[in-house]
Amino acid sequence: MIKTYEIKNGLWQVKVSAELGGNVVSLKYDGKDVFVPLENMEQLAANPYIQGAPILLPANRTADGKFSFEGENYQLEITEASTGANLHGIVHRQPFTVIEHSEDKITLCFENNGQAYPFNFVLTVTYYFENDAFAQRYDIKNTGSGNVPFTFALHTTFVEPESFDVPIDACHKKNEKHLPIGGYFPLNEQESRYVTGSPSKDISASGYYRACGNTAHIGHFSYTVSDNLTIGFFLTVQGREDFCVLSHNAAL
């Protein structure tokens, strides 16, 4: 049984799991699912990235789980056997602590002392409502003595809409292991329709895209990120009724 905390306002109803990375496991508007809801742990185990809006830190794949920073070498857990990479870190698996909970707001935090990422920081997440919209705020505080390198992203998965548009203008080049290799491809004919508006039915697509704005439209809903993030990647998978928009703080 997954313990959840509920907040609501007007027609919005949100359920958050502290134990599952502080994730939004259900988001409804007027009784209808907006995010793909988490229904059971088997669903989460099959693919933890397409349930709600999991926090990815570091985002995307780290080749061989290895990176260097300021003269030091670091090794992350290999979480994707097929590519031998660390995929999206493990913060989304960590239990968060609820520090404030009211009818229309919840704040949770995760204190990392090296268990999920080899640097010290505190990540605070607040879910609330503003101007009849559901809002998410993320604050990361460096609690160590040195600099902290990170990429941060949200893998937000909506119930598949009838149509969508996303602000993208180029596609990142990547290798066979889905790692960016530098440079861009121009959008093809189908991808160009994603910018002006496209039906989502029967589309099978996956790619890293450069953002040229901060608002996407998913059906009747707008998804807007702050200037600290960009919308740079989206995914639909044919045969599944979901639609993913990934917002992140740096090039992936």
Where are these regions (language model features)?
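Extended, loop-rich substrate-binding clefts of extracytoplasmic carbohydrate-active enzymes
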Residues: E6-K8, E72, E77-N131
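Beta-strand-rich N-terminal accessory domains
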Residues: M1-L76, A216-R240
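Acidic, contiguous internal or C-terminal segments within carbohydrate-active enzymes
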Residues: I7, V14, A18, F110-E162
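Short hydrophobic/aromatic-rich beta-strand segments that constitute the beta-sheet cores
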Residues: S26-L27, L76, T107-F110, A135-Y138, ...
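Short, intrinsically disordered, charge-balanced linker/junction segments flanking boundaries
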Residues: G239-L252
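Active-site/ligand-binding surface loops and adjacent short beta/alpha elements
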Residues: Q75, N147-P149, T157-Q238
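Short Pro/Gly-enriched beta-strand edge/turn motifs at strand-loop
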Residues: A45-P54, E77-S82, I106-E111, D202-S206
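Glycine-rich, pocket-lining loop/helix-strand segments that form or immediately flank
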Residues: D33-Y49, Y74-P95, P167-N175, P180-Y184
